Amino acid sequence: MNEHTVKAFDEDIGELRGLIAQMGGLAEAAIDASMDALKRHDLEAAARIIDGDKQIDELETEVERLAVRLIALRAPMADDLREVVAALKIAGVVERIGDYAKNIAKRVAAIDGHSVIEPLSLLPAMANMATDMVRNVLDAFAARDPEAAVRVCEQDRAVDDFYNSIFRTLVTFMVENPKSISQAAHMLFIAKNLERVGDHATNVAEMVYYAATGDHMGDRDQGDTVPLAGS
Amino acid sequence: MNEHTVKAFDEDIGELRGLIAQMGGLAEAAIDASMDALKRHDLEAAARIIDGDKQIDELETEVERLAVRLIALRAPMADDLREVVAALKIAGVVERIGDYAKNIAKRVAAIDGHSVIEPLSLLPAMANMATDMVRNVLDAFAARDPEAAVRVCEQDRAVDDFYNSIFRTLVTFMVENPKSISQAAHMLFIAKNLERVGDHATNVAEMVYYAATGDHMGDRDQGDTVPLAGS
């Protein structure tokens, strides 16, 4: 590559990083806003979150277009190619995090805070832990910091523990409040969505680690957290 | 492109299609097997499904490697590039469908068929509808058939209706059987996983349509199905 090509590549990859940071900021804000709408049973705010998800989707399309153009025109090799592919995949994951915020917003109408006060108070704390992971992992991506990525993976254990505790709390709540079972079931899905946000942040952390080092972080346990039977 | 390049591209894209067909077959079989393990409370079969998911993940990595090589070396334009990007994204979605089978398998231990016979009988029928969509959409991809892709999207409505009906059945069951609430909650997640399989097949259908025609199928309602409050 000549100097001009290198500079053009750096500009493109900088643009990719900027788009992903923008997506991440929107996804994080959408999750915070969904918790707020839930607490206040604010249907208008929920509708805005659902509608706002389109913006994240559009940014993902822009990332794809740019990444494909970059691969096709600049034919990056090794490290650079690994970084473009990581950006493409990270954008896909952040888009899914945005979808979780949208899904939570869709449940606002189904949950009336007054009748399910107790378990409702646990969700925002869990949401904070999950969005914290998203923020940290995107910072790690921007800084190409593999150590920060490892720390994000460690945070995921706390989110999983929190999820298991909410699952048990909600099942107990259902047993004691059969009239609120439908609402509690919706809250169970919200807790699961937040747990998945943590999983996705972990996935991104692994991609950041791989893009920065060329090595895999090792076979960590991924995927759905299933509390033990009878819990 | 000269004749040699065209032929090499066709071979590569054929290999991509073959890998995706293989992934789809494995994902479909994993969902069927998870229903079977659930009905028979077969923990060994469940463990095999969980372990087998790695194979689908490895195939996705192979698709990525091949697609990136194809874009970088052959620099495909317009229609061809659209098809490679579609293949890349479709592989990602099929990998997620495999994850749902794994997640269902993880819940086998938490569900004892004897105490939840009634709602348990509904899940395999829903699973059949969802895997039918997966099979049809991968056939549509192999045949580059946009009309078949549209039909897959239409099938998704039936899966969503089924999900809403299972949600109501399970909530009623929980009210009447407070001791089985934890198990019923796991079944709710299984039903939700199957509903998401249908959504993902719909996403793939839209990619197949776009890859084949260059047009978007139109703004269909996507994402999480949330039954109405009080249902």
Predicted features by range, described:
Chain A
Residues 1-231:
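Cytosolic, long alpha-helical scaffolding segments
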